[in-house]
């Protein structure tokens, strides 16, 4: 009888071990599909499915509490053993509590909050409130004296050397920016590198030298793992400009060989001030304005500069329909200073901070209230006389075409044939002051209907004759009569084939 009872024990032990193994496997993210509570998934009965973890958070500010429940994909669990997304965080004025779990609907819970009503101020607290500002003023004065004494006013934190350990967990050794961009364009969403990768790159860049200043900030040449990059640094006052430009650059399917290659955006806070960074490809020739000031160009060089500019603008203006589509974009500040010259003699369009996107589904334009923006010298007639139709997206594209015609004029003047060329000049240099007002430009362009002078010598060269014809058709007072960027691109492509030019 005892032998009969003892016989099943090994079988029972095996069943227990199997159950334990199954339970352990269930704890690993990605082991099986999880069903999680999702407060935004109204069409799916507030349920989402993931191969990672369920997530719930509560963010507390001084005046409200925000609850968030959703799925976290396994690919976003970085690092895998202690994901950043599952860690609590705190910022000035807010505290976020998070919880990650791996059971079906395990995130359908209410996390405890810590915000409590503050009691009335007692004598000690009242004294602290009064003494606090006084102490702050004293400390500030002492700090100013210290800074003046040492004569060191630091505007940018420039590390002496890179610390590769900072990016090792996320970006493997030997990985280049070209590798990261290629991976992003072939397997990603097409809207830019993941934010964590962008931040990792930005925080391991070594600034080398300041190479220019613009309307919203300063541009530096920097290095990341030996590769040169351009870093546009905005002050904290220009946060909206920084955010807008980063947002436009990360538009799905925007990447193009004739649009400046965006790499990363990051905000760097050292406790005293905040710097807002935009990291992009570095082009040693600088802007087209600088390039034309320094060099003349051949017929081939002129066609390359013009065709690549037209190709970039045509890509901006084009809407790509589909799940990985791209909205049509108008630049609104096209000029030679916002076009960069690449090492191979072609151009890429930069400075998209004033650009607007068109949503064809709703026929709306995301535009700031102030529509008279950009550089006055390059403003189209309809912008100068305030007759532009702000609700019609084609109006903005036509204004870009007018500006590109002026850029082509700048390029063609520097085309040297038989040693003959014109000095570099800005459009309307002989008609308006160096910094013209809107009224001065309106008088010349709209009332007198003047346009930049086209030299007679251009008629003796087929390439310059074609360029002159394109310019005139870009400068029509009636925007609807102007050429499109795609038409200009095709005309210049035919010209390059006739001249035997390989792009």
From Swiss-Prot:
Sites of Phosphoserine modification: 165, 187, 189, 191
Tissue specificity comment: Found in all tissues examined, most abundant in placenta and least abundant in brain and heart. Expressed in a variety of cancer cell lines.
Activity control: Kept in an inactive conformation by FKBP1A preventing receptor activation in absence of ligand. CD109 is another inhibitor of the receptor.
What residue ranges lie in the Cytoplasmic compartment?
A: 148-503
InterPro entries referenced in this protein's UniProt entry, alphabetically: Activin_recp, GS_dom, Kinase-like_dom_sf, Prot_kinase_dom, Protein_kinase_ATP_BS, Ser/Thr_kinase_AS, Snake_toxin-like_sf, TGFB_receptor
The uppermost taxa in this organism's lineage are:
Eukaryota, Metazoa, Chordata, Craniata, Vertebrata
Q: What residue stretches are annotated with the GS domain?
A: 175-204
Q: Which UniProt keywords apply?
A: Aortic aneurysm, Apoptosis, ATP-binding, Cell junction, Cell membrane, Craniosynostosis, Differentiation, Disease variant, Disulfide bond, Glycoprotein, Growth regulation, Isopeptide bond, Kinase, Magnesium, Manganese, Membrane, Metal-binding, Nucleotide-binding, Phosphoprotein, Receptor, Serine/threonine-protein kinase, Signal, Tight junction, Transferase, Transmembrane, Transmembrane helix, Ubl conjugation
Provide the function of this protein.
Transmembrane serine/threonine kinase forming with the TGF-beta type II serine/threonine kinase receptor, TGFBR2, the non-promiscuous receptor for the TGF-beta cytokines TGFB1, TGFB2 and TGFB3. Transduces the TGFB1, TGFB2 and TGFB3 signal from the cell surface to the cytoplasm and is thus regulating a plethora of physiological and pathological processes including cell cycle arrest in epithelial and hematopoietic cells, control of mesenchymal cell proliferation and differentiation, wound healing, extracellular matrix production, immunosuppression and carcinogenesis.
Q: What SUPFAM superfamilies does the record point to?
A: Protein kinase-like (PK-like), Snake toxin-like
State the post-translational modifications: Phosphorylated at basal levels in the absence of ligand. Activated upon phosphorylation by TGFBR2, mainly in the GS domain. Phosphorylation in the GS domain abrogates FKBP1A-binding.
Q: Which SMART domains match?
A: GS (SM00467), S_TKc (SM00220)
Class of this enzyme = transferase
* Bilayer-spanning residue ranges: 127-147
Provide the Protein kinase domain boundaries.
Answer: 205-495
Report which reactions are catalysed by this protein: L-threonyl-[receptor-protein] + ATP = O-phospho-L-threonyl-[receptor-protein] + ADP + H(+); L-seryl-[receptor-protein] + ATP = O-phospho-L-seryl-[receptor-protein] + ADP + H(+)
State the species of origin: Homo sapiens (Human)
Record's protein name? TGF-beta receptor type-1
Oligomer status and interactors: Homodimer; in the endoplasmic reticulum but also at the cell membrane. Heterohexamer; TGFB1, TGFB2 and TGFB3 homodimeric ligands assemble a functional receptor composed of two TGFBR1 and TGFBR2 heterodimers to form a ligand-receptor heterohexamer. The respective affinity of TGBRB1 and TGFBR2 for the ligands may modulate the kinetics of assembly of the receptor and may explain the different biological activities of TGFB1, TGFB2 and TGFB3.
Q: Does the keyword Glycoprotein apply?
A: yes
Give residue ranges on the Extracellular side.
34-126
Q: So what EC number does this one have?
A: 2.7.11.30
């Amino acid at each position: 009888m005892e032998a009969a009872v003892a016989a099943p024990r090994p079988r029972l032990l095996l069943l227990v071990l199997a159950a334990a193994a199954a339970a352990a496997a269930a704890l690993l993210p990605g082991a099986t599909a999880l069903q999680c509570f999702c407060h935004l998934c109204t069409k799916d009965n507030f349920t989402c499915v993931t191969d990672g973890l369920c997530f719930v958070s509560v963010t507390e500010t001084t005046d409200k509490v925000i609850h968030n429940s959703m799925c976290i994909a396994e690919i976003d669990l970085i690092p895998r053993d202690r994901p950043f997304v599952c860690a609590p965080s705190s910022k000035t004025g807010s505290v976020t509590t998070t919880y990650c779990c791996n059971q079906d609907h395990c995130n359908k819970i209410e996390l405890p909050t810590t915000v409590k009503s503050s009691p009335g101020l007692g004598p000690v607290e009242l004294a602290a409130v009064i003494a606090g500002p006084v102490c702050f003023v004293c400390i500030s004065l002492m700090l100013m004296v210290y800074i003046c004494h040492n004569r060191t006013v630091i505007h940018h934190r420039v590390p002496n050397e890179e610390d590769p350990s900072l990016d090792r967990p996320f970006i493997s050794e030997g990985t280049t920016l070209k590798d990261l961009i290629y991976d992003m364009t072939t397997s990603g969403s097409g809207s830019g590198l993941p934010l964590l990768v962008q931040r990792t790159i930005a925080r391991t860049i070594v600034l080398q030298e300041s190479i220019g200043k613009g309307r919203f900030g300063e541009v530096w040449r920097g290095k990341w793992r030996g590769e040169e990059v351009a870093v546009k640094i905005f002050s904290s006052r220009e946060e909206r400009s920084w955010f807008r430009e980063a947002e436009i650059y990360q538009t799905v399917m925007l990447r193009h060989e004739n649009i400046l290659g965006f790499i990363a955006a990051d905000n760097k806070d050292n406790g005293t001030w905040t710097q807002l960074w935009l990291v992009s490809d570095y082009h040693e020739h600088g802007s087209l304005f600088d390039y034309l000031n320094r060099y003349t160009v051949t017929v081939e060089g002129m066609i390359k500069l013009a065709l690549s500019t037209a190709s970039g603008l045509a890509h901006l203006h084009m809407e790509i329909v589909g799940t990985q589509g791209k909205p049509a974009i108008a630049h609104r500040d096209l000029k030679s200073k916002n076009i960069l010259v690449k090492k191979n003699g072609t151009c890429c369009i930069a400075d998209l901070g004033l650009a607007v996107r068109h949503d064809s589904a709703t026929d709306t334009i995301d535009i700031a209230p102030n529509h008279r923006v950009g550089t006055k010298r390059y403003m189209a007639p309809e912008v100068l006389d305030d007759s532009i139709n702000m609700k019609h997206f084609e109006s903005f594209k036509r204004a870009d075409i007018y500006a590109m015609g002026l850029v082509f004029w700048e390029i063609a003047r520097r085309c040297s044939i038989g040693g003959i060329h014109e000095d570099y000049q800005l459009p309307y240099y002989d008609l308006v002051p160096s910094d013209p007002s809107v009224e001065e430009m309106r008088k010349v362009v709209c009332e007198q209907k003047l346009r930049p002078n086209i030299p007679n010598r251009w008629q003796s060269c087929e390439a310059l004759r074609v360029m002159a014809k394109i310019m005139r058709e870009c400068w029509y007072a009636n925007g609807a009569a102007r050429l499109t960027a795609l038409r200009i691109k095709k005309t210049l492509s035919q010209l390059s084939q006739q001249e035997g030019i390989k792009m």
